From Swiss-Prot:
Other notes: The reverse transcriptase is an error-prone enzyme that lacks a proof-reading function. High mutations rate is a direct consequence of this characteristic. RT also displays frequent template switching leading to high recombination rate. Recombination mostly occurs between homologous regions of the two copackaged RNA genomes. If these two RNA molecules derive from different viral strains, reverse transcription will give rise to highly recombinated proviral DNAs.
Residues that, per the record, bind Mg(2+) 3: D1291, D1343, E1379
Ligand binding (Mg(2+) 1): D652, D727, D728
Protein name per UniProt: Gag-Pol polyprotein
Record domain Reverse transcriptase: where: 587-776
Species: Maedi visna virus (strain KV1772) (MVV)
Active site as annotated: D464 (protease)
Length: 1506
């Protein structure tokens, strides 16, 4: 007893964590779990029953022993209830001991039963658990079916470790996850079918998922039975599922196929349920929202469950289960209170009864009253129960004598599941109101039907505003027969009987109307002919949002909606608008806006040709403030991408926009105002409930909505070709005529359920069919308008010309001809009423297009055949044709020429567009046919002229673009142009001289061949229709006479020459050898070889011969403050002759006003930008307007004299060796120093050392430099840090909008900088590799920026062997040197940027200035110091290696651990970290000696012989 007392006191501490885990297992389907007391009671009871096991520790072995003994007990030895509780609690403790986590007690019992109870090895029952399960703790085999050595097979139970691993995966990732599927497929390869299904059933998981898995397995079994009729060698479903088999029988080889099929079924079921769980409509994801009523939640849930492709029993189970588990907490509590323990088995109707008031104010007050009410006595059942059917306490709704109420129709006597109207979900009775608009309308059935008495019979007729006639299938012969009548509608052309004066009655309204009797009609229709007489109107705005989903739209961030006042309207327009708005309000399309909706959009109206008013809304401001939606449809469908079909039908959706609801929170921004005439009353404000016309998102919302509605229907009909663009629907098929019309009829009925109507008069059945501006025929397609209007010579406005060209461009897919002259005519004045003049060339172009449109016909796409695209040159454009058979184009098109692209590049651009069109319209990659020869295109690709080629291409001999018949090698009447071009005096020049005395020359860069061709091009530009060209270039001469029909153009100059020559009447081309004494040829050669006065830019004007200078133009408006100087850069670069220099002077008109030019000398050969320095001597500000002549450039002859010494007779007081006290002629170096400084802006020390001028003269040069004075740097040096050879600092700096990465070597001051794309780690690591390759650094200092401290950066530094340290950002002590370098770099860069075209070039020039041109105190640059340090390192390393190469030592050897005598000295042959190798002279052997037995000595000195 003492032991027992201690046991009770301790409370089984070794099982503390096990008991804690056991307390999380639920007792049943509710939330009640096991307690610690339950576990202690079970353990104590077991100790009491089995005293021989009491002293043993609670291991898994003991638990299995106790479990075996409990199974041997009979219930009579203890009470049945306590025995069952004891066994169940022990099973839970055993599962927790093994690390398993069953959800319920029942699941725990199943797991233990599977692990022990399924074993059929009865001989091992009495053995210990370790012997029975040798692999319980660590498993070596996972297969229950094992091959015996003696032959045959045996069965072995699934091991607990395997089961535990599967259970863990199921709990962590889910029962239908891919991870669980892979694990199960791995372990279950040789399991029996029974093992597979039992393990799957015992896995933790959602009960609904398990039911779905079971349903999928049943479907697989049914499919097996259908596909495999019973036979002698056919497996049955029972054999596959392991029903009625022992484990030994199921493990035999003849059942391998059955096991594999069973495993395949299970994997398929898991995948199916997993895919279902990922779908948006998955019912298990449908959960009740906090603000949602339980009825709305159930409606969404039932809709999702009904859409699931599962059997009815599974749907029933899902409805019963998910209606409770997915409900909100309040509803679950209410159902628990009302339905008690049977809440899981209660029907959906009972749960709806229980929760119908949840969330209402009364419900909240009821909960509050219950919370404040004192608790009643125990045992008073039913006192607080209340019937939600009659409201009386004491009984539940299902016990109410008044009868249960249906929550669908509201009538008593039946439940919702038995309601007859349930199948007509969404239908309402006549006179009901639509939930979204609350507007009365005739019928809300889908499709809408009403009861009408026709003759003597009552019939249900479909209300169809698109039908002209009323059609019935039978008639009682009342009325007046009018013979046969032919109708054309959705069923094609049909014939019926017409009856007039027929008695028609709707409610109390009776009329005499006309009907058509058509026995074959699938539906009886009430047409427009009788609807108006009966007073029936069908509203097209079906705003029931449960049917048509609304698309969410909203304003842009920060916008408040439009607030534009309504402008005044005339009385006539107000009356027209009132009539329209009243009709819209009656139909529920607009509603009265509340006072707090303050937004407003102006409205107005125009009168149509018919005399009716049309309402227009100015949505421009609202469109600006509204967020855009994605484009639902990126373009029009094209008939060339349609497949040929036997039957086609074109449908048109009536009132498409007005059928779709507008997103309700957005409606407040669509308000508009109806004014009151003369302000006799308050204005009436309305808002839109449907998609309004003119709103920018109406097309996108409409298209997205139709996509949602039609997606399922299209998937169910894969045999048809379906197309939709806005409200136009195309249906094509190869089915029979009746079947095709049946599908069309089905679609009409389907979309009619959503309120969309298809007007009968807009339906087109069969060919020819008009669709989206195209006319479809059985074998071809055309445009609806086959002809273009004619144009005649004479004036035409730009507006009319644009409309004509727009009509042509729309039809280019059948015309395929370019109109360059007409397009050029559209250039110039953009005013719409500006006039152009049509000439004969324009008329000819237009007529060619009109003729092509008449002749061309498009064909349909055949998916069995390949598609080809053939490109060819047109008139200043590229034309291509897409076809599958020669002569039968699908479509054609034109790509107009693009400037600055060669012909080859333009063809490739057109090929890219062609390929894109074909892929979009057919989904295939076309085979491209290019004009010319394959080797030419391959050469273009290799030369880099083009960078893309089609995937599949070949060549054909294209049509001739340029003709050579007007180029001959004979003299033609007309002037002669002597052309020449080439590199003259280091510069490219070209020009020509004519026989009439005209001259032309320009400077231009290029090769000699290019310049020769350019000279011919300029001559062709200026020459008349007939002319002669003389050249000394054999290359240019042969090119002009080449056979251009087969030539693929290789450069743009040749292409331009061909185009110019093509427009000439006749050209004679002649060649003369150069430098052979031909006067005209030598003259043109001399002419372009001269260095002539040339200018670039628009900042200078030509002068008259008598003028002194050339006027310079002010580039922009300049303001000069009083007494200030301003430097103005003008748009001018000038190239002076050798014997010229120039001076910039003041204009007299400016000098009179006190504005002067401060000098300016331009040396001969200067080619930089011209700058003018202006000084304002006035005491007030002066403004120089743009374009004003404000200075003049004066050319001066250059006079140069050689300086000679004064001679011996001349004396000077300043020195004995000539001019200057230094005795050197340094004065000659000052201009050179100034010129060098203007290039690089180096410091005075550098100039002093490089040019040998005095320090003061060098400082004067720097001080007189305006650029250096403006960008003068501060001289304060802030902070410092580690400096040394090969130690660098790095940091980013910004110059304007550019990012520069700057490195500086701390010892020499050498700078390395690169412009980078961003401050990213990847960019920094790329630049690090470049930096390392050039400088081989050893250490680096940076701040803590993310690019520098990234893990990848640290790994790179470690890989390169660079010691990387980081400092503190913004701390001058940490990054002093690189921060100083930033300032130096940017100041120098600012000086050099005007001298370079590219920023990268200016940056490179800055590095030259700072690294090479900048000299230190000892006359060395940073580059000199860096190179010197590297050379010293090399010398030291070489010396060190030589010293370490030969070493000598004394050594001793050991015998049995005892050291011997020292021997030596001798040379070390090899040295390692712990030992050396020497050669023993006595034995002539190589010995390995440990370093502890070695004494190194200096090498012996050589004794010099006397």
């Amino acid at each position: 007893m003492a032991k027992q007392g201690s046991k009770e006191k301790k409370g089984y501490p070794e099982l503390k964590e096990v008991i804690k885990a056991t307390c999380k297992i639920r007792v049943g389907p509710g939330k009640e779990t096991l307690t610690e007391g339950n576990c202690l009671w079970a353990l104590k009871t077991i100790d009491f029953i089995f005293e021989d096991l009491k002293t043993e520790p609670w291991t898994i072995t003991k638990m299995y022993t106790v479990w075996d003994r409990l199974k041997g007990l009979t219930p009579e030895e203890t009470s049945k209830r306590e025995f069952a509780s004891l066994q169940a609690t022990l099973a839970c403790i055993m599962c927790s001991q093994m690390g398993m986590k069953p959800e319920t007690v029942q699941a725990a019992k199943g797991i233990i039963s599977m692990k022990e109870g399924l074993h059929e090895n009865k001989e091992a029952k009495g053995e210990k658990v370790e012997q029975l399960y040798p692999n319980l703790e660590k498993h070596r085999e996972v297969y229950p079916i094992v091959n015996l050595q003696a032959g045959g097979r045996s069965w072995k139970a699934v091991e607990s470790v395997v089961f535990q691993q599967l259970q863990t995966v199921a709990m962590q990732h889910g029962l239908v996850s891919e991870d669980f599927e892979r694990q199960l497929a791995y372990y279950a390869t040789t399991w029996t079918s029974k093992d597979i299904l039992e393990v799957l059933a015992m896995m933790p998981g959602n009960r609904a998922q398990k039911e779905l898995i079971q349903g999928k397995l049943n479907e697989e079994a049914e499919r097996w039975v259908r596909q495999n009729p019973p036979g002698p060698n056919v497996l049955t479903v029972d054999q596959i599922m392991g029903v009625g088999q022992t484990n030994q029988q199921a493990s035999q080889a003849n059942m391998d196929q059955a096991r594999q099929i069973c495993l395949q079924w299970v994997i398929t079921a898991l995948r199916s349920v997993r895919h279902m769980s990922h779908r948006p409509g998955n019912p298990m994801l449908v959960k009740q929202k906090n603000t949602e009523s339980y009825e709305d939640f159930i409606a969404r849930l039932l809709e999702a469950i009904d859409a699931e492709p599962v059997t009815d029993p599974i749907k029933t189970y899902l409805k019963v289960t998910l209606s409770y588990t997915n409900a909100s907490t309040d509803c679950q509590k209410q159902m628990d209170r009302t339905l008690g323990t049977r809440v899981q088995q209660a029907t959906v109707e009972e749960k709806m009864q229980a929760c119908r008031d949840v969330g209402s104010e009364g419900f909240k007050m009821q909960l509050l009253a219950q919370a404040l009410r004192p608790q009643g006595k125990a045992g008073q059942k039913g006192v607080n129960q209340k019937c939600y059917n009659c409201g009386k306490p004491g009984h539940l709704a299902r016990q109410c004598r008044q009868g249960i109420i249906c929550h669908h129709c509201g009538k008593r006597g039946h439940m919702q599941k038995d309601c007859r109207q349930k199948k007509q979900q969404g239908k309402q009775q006549e006179g009901a109101t639509c939930g979204a608009v609350r507007a009365p309308y005739v019928v809300t059935e889908a499709p809408p039907k009403i009861e009408i008495k026709v003759g003597t019979r009552w019939k249900k007729l479909l209300v169809d505003t698109g039908a002209d006639k009323t059609i019935v299938t039978s008639h009682d012969m009342s009325g007046i027969p009018k013979g046969r009548i032919i109708l054309q509608g959705i069923g094609g052309i049909i014939e019926g009987e017409k009856w007039e004066q027929v008695h028609l009655q709707y409610k109390d309204k009776i009329i005499r109307g006309t009907i058509v009797v058509l026995a074959t009609s699938p539906v009886e229709v009430l047409g427009r002919d009788n609807m108006r007489e009966l007073g029936i109107g069908l509203i097209m705005a079906n705003l029931e949002e449960k049917k048509i989903p609304s698309t969410r739209v909203r304003l842009k961030e920060g916008c408040k909606g439009p607030h534009i006042a309504q402008w005044p309207l005339t009385q006539e327009k107000l009356e027209g608008l009132k009539e329209i708005v009243d009709r819209l309000e009656k139909e529920g399309k607009v509603g009265r806006a509340p006072p707090h909706w303050t937004c407003n959009t102006p409205i107005f109206c125009i009168k149509k040709k018919s005399g009716k008013w049309r309402m227009l809304i100015d949505f421009r401001e609202l469109n600006k403030q509204t967020e855009d939606l994605a484009e639902a449809q990126l373009g029009l469908p094209h008939p060339g991408g349609l497949q040929r079909k036997k039957h086609v039908t074109i449908l048109d959706i009536g009132d498409a926009y007005f059928t779709i609801p507008l997103y309700e929170p957005y409606r407040q921004y669509t308000c508009f105002t109806m004014l009151s005439p003369n302000n006799l009353g308050p204005c009436v404000r309305y808002y839109w409930k449907v998609l309004p016309q003119g709103w920018k998102l109406s097309p996108a919302v409409y298209q997205f909505t139709m996509q949602k509605i039609l997606r399922g229907w299209i998937e169910e009909h894969p045999m048809i070709q379906f197309g939709i663009y806005m409200d136009d629907i195309y249906i094509g098929s190869d089915l029979g005529l009746e079947e095709h019309r049946g599908i069309v009829n089905e679609l009409a009925s389907y979309i009619a359920q959503y309120g969309f109507m298809l007007p009968e008069d807009k339906r087109q059945e069969g060919y020819p069919a008009k669709w989206l501006g195209f006319e479809l025929h059985p074998e071809k397609w055309k445009f609806q308008k086959h002809t273009l209007p004619e144009i005649t010579e004479g004036p035409i406005t730009l507006n009319k010309l644009q409309k004509l060209v727009g009509d042509l461009v729309w039809r280019q897919s059948l015309i395929g001809k370019s109109i360059p002259n007409i397009l050029k005519l559209m250039e110039g004045d953009r005013a719409l009423q500006s006039e152009r003049y049509i000439e004969s060339i324009h008329v000819r172009e237009w007529e060619a297009c009109r003729q092509k449109l008449k002749e061309m016909e498009g064909n349909y796409y055949d998916e069995e055949k390949d598609i080809y695209g053939q490109l060819d040159w047109g008139n200043k454009a590229i034309e291509y044709i897409v076809f599958q058979e020669k002569g039968k184009p699908l479509w054609v098109n034109v790509v107009h020429s693009i400037k600055n692209l060669s012909q080859a590049q333009q063809i490739i651009k057109a090929a890219q567009k062609l390929t894109q069109e074909v892929i979009i319209r057919t989904g295939k990659i076309p085979w491209i046919l290019l004009p010319g020869r394959e080797e030419d295109w391959i050469l273009e690709l290799q030369m880099g002229n083009i960078n893309w080629m089609p995937s599949f291409w070949s060549c054909y001999k294209g049509s001739v673009r340029w003709k050579k018949r007007n180029v001959i090698a004979e003299v033609v009447p007309g002037p002669t142009y002597y052309t020449d071009g080439g590199k003259k005096n280091g510069r490219g020049s070209l020009g020509y001289i004519t026989s009439t005395g005209e001259k032309f020359r320009i400077h231009e860069e290029g090769t000699n061949q290019q310049l020769e061709l350019r000279a011919i091009e300029e001559a062709c530009k200026q020459g008349p229709e007939k002319m002669n060209i003389v050249t000394d270039s054999r290359y240019a001469y042969e090119f002009m006479l080449r056979n251009w029909d087969e030539e693929v153009i290789r450069n743009p100059i040749q292409a331009r020459i061909m185009e110019l020559v093509h427009n000439k009447e006749k050209i004679g081309v002649h060649w003369v050898p150069g430098h052979k004494g031909i006067p005209q040829n030598e003259e043109i050669d001399r002419y372009i070889s001269e260095i002539f006065l040339a200018k670039e830019g628009r900042g200078i004007l030509q002068k008259r011969a008598e003028d002194a200078g050339y006027d310079l133009i002010c580039p922009q408006e300049i303001s000069i403050p009083a007494g200030q100087v301003k430097r103005i850069a003008i748009d001018l670069k000038i190239n002076l002759k050798k014997d010229q220099w120039a001076m910039i002077g003041t204009k007299s008109s400016f000098a009179n006003k006190g504005v002067f030019v401060q000098g300016g000398i331009i040396d001969s050969g200067y080619q930089g930008t011209i700058q003018v320095v202006i000084y304002n001597s006035n005491n007030k500000e002066v403004v120089i307007p743009q374009g004003r002549k404000f200075a003049q450039l004066i050319l001066m002859p250059l006079i140069h004299e050689e300086l000679e010494p004064w001679g011996e007779t001349r004396k000077t007081e300043r020195g004995e060796q000539g001019f200057g006290s230094t005795g050197m002629y340094w004065i000659e170096n000052i201009p050179l120093a100034e010129e060098e400084h203007n290039k690089w802006h180096q410091d005075a020390v550098s100039l002093h050392l490089e040019f040998g001028i005095p320090r003061t003269a060098a400082e004067d040069i720097v001080q007189q430099c305006d650029v250096c004075q403006e960008n003068k740097m501060p001289s304060t040096l802030r902070g410092s840090n580690k400096r040394g050879i090969d130690h660098w600092q790095v940091d980013y700096t910004h110059y304007e909008d550019k990012i520069i990465l700057v490195w500086v070597e701390t010892n020499s001051g050498l700078i390395y900088a690169e412009r980078v794309k961003g401050e990213t780690g990847q960019e920094f690591r790329v630049q690090t590799m470049k930096w390392y390759a050039m400088f081989a650094p050893k250490s680096l200092q940076s701040d803590n920026g993310p690019a520098f401290v990234a893990e990848s950066t640290q790994l790179l530094m470690k890989y390169l062997g660079i010691e990387h340290t980081t400092g503190i950002p913004w701390n001058p002590q940490s990054q002093a040197l690189v921060e100083r370098t930033h300032q130096t770099l940017k100041n120098t860069l600012e000086k050099l940027i005007p001298m370079f075209n590219a920023f990268e070039s200016a940056l490179a020039g800055t590095l030259i200035t700072l690294n090479i041109k900048r000299k230190g105190g000892l006359g060395t640059s940073p580059m000199d110091i860096f190179i010197f340090n590297k050379e010293q390192q090399r010398i030291q390393q070489q010396s060190k290696s030589k010293q370490e190469k030969i070493r000598f030592c004394y050594y001793r050897t050991r015998k049995r651990g005892h050291p011997g005598e020292w021997q030596g000295p001798t040379q070390v042959l090899w040295g390692g970290d712990g030992a050396i190798v020497v050669k023993d002279r006595g034995t002539d052997r190589y010995l390995v000696i440990a370093n502890k037995d070695v004494k190194f000595i200096p090498p012996p000195k050589e004794i010099q012989k006397e």
